[in-house]
Amino acid sequence: MATPYVPVPMPIGNSASSFTTNRNQRSSSFGSVSTSSNSSKGQLEDSNMGNFKQTSVPDQMDNTSSVCSSPLIRTKFTGAASSIEYSTRPRETEEQNPETVNWEDRPSTPTILGYEVMEERAKFTVYKILVKKTPEESWVVFRRYTDFSRLNDKLKEMFPGFRLALPPKRWFKDNYNADFLEDRQLGLQAFLQNLVAHKDIANCLAVREFLCLDDPPGPFDSLEESRVFCETLEETNYRLQKELLEKQKEMESLKKQLSEKQLHIDTLENRIRTLSLEPEESLDVSETEGEQILKVESSALEVDQDVLDEESRADNEPCLHFSEPENAISEIEVAEVAYDAEED
């Protein structure tokens, strides 16, 4: 048989003044007294063997006015034959005179953050409840279903005409089924909403002890509370590291895009520079070709001039040559004739 569960609360955003009370005499709800850290160590020390499951719960902590105007909540439990209704409507007198209600006299709706299955000696489930007294002061307490049941019994004795409709027990099926635990968590959340929806119930001693309203726990009151505080820091560290990794991936992607854009810009600049240099090169080529054409034309003119000079010289020279041979022949003939005449 498991010993009574000792709650292990953890503050979130506590002010310095909340640590001044004497915490050595703080008692848990309904007879479970925390005498030392060793008494609860056996129940929560091996929490890593359990399976802690966080489920999404609507955040109703900051809007206290929604408690009075919230509709009827209907929850159907796994294996149950009928649905159970959880009413969050305020008392009739408060509905008639809403302006006279002092919202500071009651806490905001506690939120069940999740549950954890403990398997140290006897297997059981604890529910992690976030209690927010003010926007600046909040803490976490751990409660078993047995603690909720004891609170419901006490409230029945104190308020006989009021029924909070606690989710029923489950006798012959697996109490650690995930679907069943989620349904029970929803029912317990509606139960807590009913607690704070009525001023008299929210301010009674049983509820204040259940939520530790008069003696908010500190993060280092016991070994278990320190463990929960360290786990919260680890979760925060993991979340921040995950965000940092995502930012680094995004930065690497942006760097890659930037390098691609820069390469594209360099390519365009080189292309523009090439296009701007092509007209100058064509102009240089045309000038060179023009000079070569001029040189060729001048050379051709020189050649033509030489040819004309040679032709003119050739026209003058044949007259002289033809006249001289005629004279020579006549002389030869005269000489031959004269010689022959002498021989005769």
From Swiss-Prot:
GO terms for MF: phosphatidylinositol binding
Q: Which keywords does the record carry?
A: Coiled coil, Cytoplasm, Endosome, Lipid-binding, Lysosome, Membrane, Phosphoprotein, Protein transport, Transport
Where on the tree of life does the source sit, at the highest rank?
Eukaryota
**Where do the record's region annotations for Disordered lie?**
1-66, 83-107
Name of one Pfam family that matches? PX
**Compartments, record wording:** Early endosome membrane; Late endosome membrane; Cytoplasm; Lysosome
**At what positions is Phosphoserine found?**
S222
Q: Which residues form a coiled coil?
A: 223-278
Residues the entry annotates as binding a 1,2-diacyl-sn-glycero-3-phospho-(1D-myo-inositol-3-phosphate):
R144, T146, R184
Task: Name any Gene Ontology BP term.
Answer: early endosome to late endosome transport
User: Gene Ontology cellular component?
Assistant: early endosome; early endosome membrane; endosome membrane; late endosome; late endosome membrane; lysosome
Q: Locate the compositionally biased regions of type Low complexity.
A: 27-40
Q: Report the residue ranges that make up the PX domain in this protein.
A: 105-218
Q: Where is the composition biased (Polar residues)?
A: 14-26, 41-66
Q: How does it assemble?
A: Homooligomer. Interacts with EGFR.
How are the domains described in the entry? The PX domain mediates interaction with membranes enriched in phosphatidylinositol 3-phosphate.
Q: Which family does it belong to?
A: Belongs to the sorting nexin family.
* Function in brief: May be involved in several stages of intracellular trafficking. Plays a role in protein transport from early to late endosomes. Plays a role in protein transport to the lysosome. Promotes degradation of EGFR after EGF signaling.
Name listed for the protein in its UniProt record: Sorting nexin-16
